[in-house]
Amino acid sequence: MGSDRWKNIRGTPQMEDSVQEKSQRKGCGYILCTVLLSVAVLLAVTVTGAVLFMNQYHAPSTEPPPVITTNMEDPNALVTIERADSSHINIFIDPNCPDTFPRLEGLQSTMLSALADHDSEQKMAGGKERALLTSLSDQVAQMVSQVARQRADWENVKKVQNGLGTEIGALKNEQGRLIKLLSEGQSHVAQLGSSVSEVLETVQRELGSGRPRLKADLQRAPSRSARPRGCANGSKPRDCYDIYMSGQQEDGVYSVFPIHYPSGFQVFCDMTTDGGGWTVFQRREDGSVNFFQGWEQYRDGFGKLTGEHWLGLQGIHLLTMQAHYQLRIDLEDFDNATAYAVYNTFGVGLFSVNPEEDGYPITVSDYTGTAGDSLGKHSGMKFTTKDLDNDHSENNCATFYHGAWWYRNCHTSNLNGQYLRGHHASYADGIEWSSWTGWQYSLKFTEMKIRPQREEN
């Protein structure tokens, strides 16, 4: 199609030359005929006037007037006058047209010049058009090439996309498989952790009741059974049991002097419950003391000995290092119902060279009582406060349950929790003993106290 148009463009000037030449010839013919006709008319009028003039000034004649006609027989004669005597007068026009043809030639030259200029302009316009067509053709070729490249790029992108889709599908399948394996692994780890915890509890029970106490025995003073009852010979009482055995059997505040702390400190002694001689180290009864304290307070103790108080981890450790102690916990709810739990083996930091660095771990086993065992699962755990997290939970159990305790992950008892007065909407953040009242009942009264095991008396 482009080549046909190119041929048409190239053939256009020749056709225009032929048309222009024909137009020039036709124009010259019209002008020549017009001039000749004008001259003929003028001559005819002149001849007619002359004849009339001659007729006017000569005697009238009986001869008929001359007849003026165009001579069709002689193509060179413009007009023929036939006289009365049948003679003819032919009027000719010089075919060279001496005055008209130069002007016609000038006009023709002007027209030819104009036509030449017009042809030149058309040729110039045709050249510009050809240049424009060439430029457009180049641009179209470039665009076609670019489209072809883009199409090829798009095909490559589609291939890459398909490959990525396949790889992503494979990765998703692998991810699902790994998630399944991880879930199974977590389940196995949880089972293993539970098994290990049970084994540790068993070992701790054995340690608490048997040979591992040897290390603690080596750090203790001579056996209590070797010392006379009543602290004879001026010896100082090591705990409330010594005071009870010396004859003082009224409840109250007394001074005790543990073997490894000869300067001593004061404690509250329960001389009436289950045979007396109990050294109290924790009491909750009215909510008058804030038990949501930090590490230093729980290490050193706080509160009032005759009311709500915590003796202190250091004091509990010093007492339980002297002999084999048992723990008694008395509980009371807001309906005045009571229950108790006794652990025949109890100690804090028994096997620690530096108990504070070790977190004052608890050893407790051999439960009996009516409240249910809500402390045995805490055996072996370090003490946790709101500012020192020693538990196994991702969160700080002391902060989460608003207390301080030997938390594991997190608790089955929380006797240092908030004093919430019975049933509460929050979960397990009151004074809880879950095996007796569940996790949403805060007890009215609790008391934790220790005494040497009776077989050592």
Curated annotation (Swiss-Prot):
Fibrinogen C-terminal domain ranges (all copies): 231-454
Keywords: Calcium, Chitin-binding, Disulfide bond, Glycoprotein, Membrane, Metal-binding, Signal-anchor, Transmembrane, Transmembrane helix
Transmembrane segments: 34-54
Residues annotated as site: Implicated in ligand binding: Y401, H411, Y427, A428
Domain of life: Eukaryota
Binding site for Ca(2+): D389, D391
Subunit structure: Homotetramer; disulfide-linked.
Name under which the protein is recorded: Fibrinogen C domain-containing protein 1-B
UniProt organism field: Xenopus laevis (African clawed frog)
Gene (name only): fibcd1-b
